């Protein structure tokens, strides 16, 4: 076939497909290159040979089996590659898989798309189960346009980090096998970030694969906004520094004995500590000196942010509460990687899988639990300690298990919700409990009156979480309706509504200066909101699954977020950059808490462990270390396994005592 005929066939094909302007441009181009000679267009309707050629090409182009064959060959090649490069090469499989499926659905090959999806979904369920469950509902071309998740995938690109040799191996395969379909999908939906050096390991997947596109552009624009993450002016910590800092050892002993009167378990631990040998005391003194040195080094290397003014009218703190907080701060134990705490763990028994959430007051004296039967139960640990351990646990599984030795319940029962309770949290002084429920309401309870005071209505769907601000009075809530809201205790309408997440907002946390709140969502992002304007000022992208827990560092600069897969990510609020992921849990991370000075992070998980992390070293990585890939995830300093008890809640007290709570469950066989 001579070039003239080929050009005629191409023009005929373009006209058949409706690309008349392209056909016209090709005719004019050919006319110019042939020195003005006329270009004779072929009527492909009257040319059997041309019609046959066009039809065969069109059939091959629309053949749904090409997707399955192309993906299967690419998959086999990647799995059979050398172990050194296999993991990097496998990173392209998930983006190619989802776009092959959506292309098949978009072309109307529904049955072939379902067969393709079911054949290869097991390869990706471990990491992308929730995404696959959403894609499973895409069954027609109209679904691709209607479903926001599918639209975002079609418009976005995936950034994948490849070493130079892995990238060359992939290109060589695509060209040698003439895999034009796979090449087109990869070219359209994947951006490769090629670096020199050795391939990265499987533990680097979180940073190596990120979604870019219109959403990423929006996030980059938002993350350029300036935020004031410093602490408030004239804070209690500043007053403490001005008045002389820590108390003497004798004053510390008085503070510890007073704190022990409020909590029997703390009293017993203090007595045991007093019975320790002088050698142990010497070791503790050395550890304290080492910790002090570490703290001094940190103050030299990390300059604090300028103090800021509150954007909300904060409540006036009573003198008694202020003095109590200052006393706790003076007696606070300095923690570090060489001076780690133990855990005081509260275990719920006989819950019959009904415990949804739990919370601990700032000093550990009160413990609350929210249950599926719409009830809230509050235990006063000081009273229980005085009554003896018999009040804590029943000997049998009867209906009288809540009755203590004196004929009274060992807890206070709060009834008012009409659906499962998903969060219950104490106010900073411990005089109120805030609860949220599937009945779409938030309720405020008094721990002194043991009664419901206010019912807040505004959300349209179940409310997953509600948290008091660090100074009380204000609180934030988040819901299945994809919004977060800010409330004050004296008003039944929300003060602000934060909208922007693409899915459920699962958790909420206040910034220490009360000018911002952070929200974690099932859309795998964390957002930071300005409470005064209601605007989103930061979007943190990097999680692979729904975000279930959040914690702010005491200095307000860093944030930790935990997800359903067990990954914890450390974020710098000023730059919206992930400092380092913390890998170690193998199930949902339900609770996070920073120590008082911010040197340690505690995490509680459904894998029945509490882990301690040294977060100070993770925040001191240089740019050169990050560029060279030396920002390896920190291993936990210490792991505390529980007795088949998933950790629902944990928190550091103001004196740096670590409390945790969970419901015992039957161990898996």
UniProtKB/Swiss-Prot annotation:
TAFs are components of the transcription factor IID (TFIID) complex that is essential for mediating regulation of RNA polymerase transcription. It holds the Pfam family TFIID_NTD2. WD repeats lie at residues 350-389, 416-455, 458-497, 500-541, 543-581, 584-623. Expressed in roots, leaves and inflorescences. GO terms for cellular component: nucleus. Residues 249-271 have a biased composition (Basic and acidic residues). The keyword Repeat applies. Component of the TFIID complexe. TFIID is composed of TATA binding protein (TBP) and a number of TBP-associated factors (TAFs) whose MWs range from 14-217 kDa. May homodimerize to form the scaffold for the complex. Interacts with TAF4, TAF4B, TAF6B, TAF8, TAF9, TAF12B, TAF14 and TAF15B. Its main location: nucleus. This is Transcription initiation factor TFIID subunit 5. Keywords: Activator, Nucleus, Repeat, Transcription, Transcription regulation, WD repeat. Residues 244-285 are annotated as: Disordered. It comes from Arabidopsis thaliana (Mouse-ear cress).
């Amino acid at each position: 076939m001579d070039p003239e005929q080929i050009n005629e066939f191409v023009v005929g094909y373009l006209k058949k497909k409706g690309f008349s302007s392209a056909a016209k441009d090709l005719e004019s181009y050919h006319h110019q290159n042939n020195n003005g000679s006329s270009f004779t267009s072929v009527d492909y309707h009257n040319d059997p040979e041309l019609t046959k050629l066009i039809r065969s090409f069109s059939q091959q182009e629309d053949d749904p089996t090409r997707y399955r064959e192309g993906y299967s060959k690419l998959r086999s090649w990647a799995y059979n590659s050398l172990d050194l490069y296999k993991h990097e090469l496998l990173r392209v499989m998930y983006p190619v898989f989802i776009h092959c499926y959506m292309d098949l659905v978009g072309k109307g090959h529904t049955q072939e798309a379902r067969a393709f999806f079911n054949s290869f979904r097991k390869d990706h369920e471990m990491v992308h189960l929730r995404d696959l469950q959403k894609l499973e509902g895409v069954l027609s071309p109209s679904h691709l346009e209607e479903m926001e998740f599918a639209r975002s995938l079609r418009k976005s690109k995936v950034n994948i980090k490849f070493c130079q040799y892995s990238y060359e191996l992939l290109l060589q395969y695509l060209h040698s096998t003439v895999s034009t379909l796979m090449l087109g999908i990869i070219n359209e939906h994947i951006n490769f970030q090629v670096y020199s050096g050795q391939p990265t390991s499987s533990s680097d997947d979180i940073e190596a694969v990120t979604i870019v596109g219109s959403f990423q552009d929006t996030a980059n624009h938002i993350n350029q906004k300036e935020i004031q993450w410093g602490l408030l002016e004239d804070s209690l910590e500043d007053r403490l520094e001005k008045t002389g800092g820590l108390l003497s050892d004798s004053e510390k002993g008085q503070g510890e004995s007073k704190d022990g009167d409020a909590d029997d378990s703390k009293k017993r631990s203090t007595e045991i500590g007093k019975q320790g040998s002088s050698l142990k005391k010497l070791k503790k003194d050395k550890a304290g000196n080492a910790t002090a040195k570490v703290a001094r080094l940190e103050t030299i290397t990390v300059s604090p942010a300028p103090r800021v003014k509150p954007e909300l009218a904060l409540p006036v703190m009573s003198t008694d509460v202020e003095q109590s907080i200052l006393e706790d701060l003076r007696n606070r134990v300095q923690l570090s990687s060489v001076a780690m705490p133990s855990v005081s763990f509260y275990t719920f028994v006989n819950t019959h899988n009904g415990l949804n959430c739990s919370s601990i007051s700032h000093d550990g004296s009160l413990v609350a639990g929210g249950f599926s039967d719409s009830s809230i139960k509050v235990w006063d640990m000081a009273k229980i300690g005085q009554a003896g351990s018999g009040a804590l646990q029943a000997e049998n599984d009867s209906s009288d298990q809540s009755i203590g030795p004196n004929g009274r319940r060992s807890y206070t029962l709060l009834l008012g919700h009409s659906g499962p309770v998903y969060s219950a949290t104490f106010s900073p002084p411990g005089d109120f409990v805030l609860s949220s429920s599937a009945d779409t309401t938030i309720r405020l309870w008094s721990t002194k009156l043991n009664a419901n005071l206010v019912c807040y209505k505004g959300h349209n769907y179940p409310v997953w979480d509600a948290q008091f601000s660090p100074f009380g009075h204000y609180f934030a809530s988040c819901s299945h309706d994809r919004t977060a809201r800010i409330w004050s205790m004296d008003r039944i309408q929300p003060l602000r509504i934060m909208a922007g997440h693409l899915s459920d907002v699962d958790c909420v946390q206040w910034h220490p200066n009360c000018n911002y709140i952070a929200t974690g969502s099932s859309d795998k992002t964390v957002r930071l909101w300005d409470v005064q304007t209601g605007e989103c000022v930061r979007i943190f992208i990097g999680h692979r699954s729904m975000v279930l827990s959040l914690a702010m560092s005491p200095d307000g600069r860093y944030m930790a977020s935990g997800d359903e897969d067990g990954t914890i990510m450390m974020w710098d609020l000023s730059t919206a950059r992930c400092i380092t992921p913390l890998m170690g849990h193998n199930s949902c991370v339900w609770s996070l808490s920073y120590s008082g000075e911010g040197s340690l992070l505690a995490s509680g998980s459904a894998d029945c462990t509490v882990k301690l992390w040294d977060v100070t070293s993770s925040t001191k990585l240089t740019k050169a270390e990050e560029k060279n890939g030396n920002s390896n995830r920190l291993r936990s300093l210490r792991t505390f396994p529980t007795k088949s008890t998933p950790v629902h809640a944990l928190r550091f007290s103001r004196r740096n005592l670590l409390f945790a709570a969970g419901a015992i469950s039957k161990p898996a066989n």
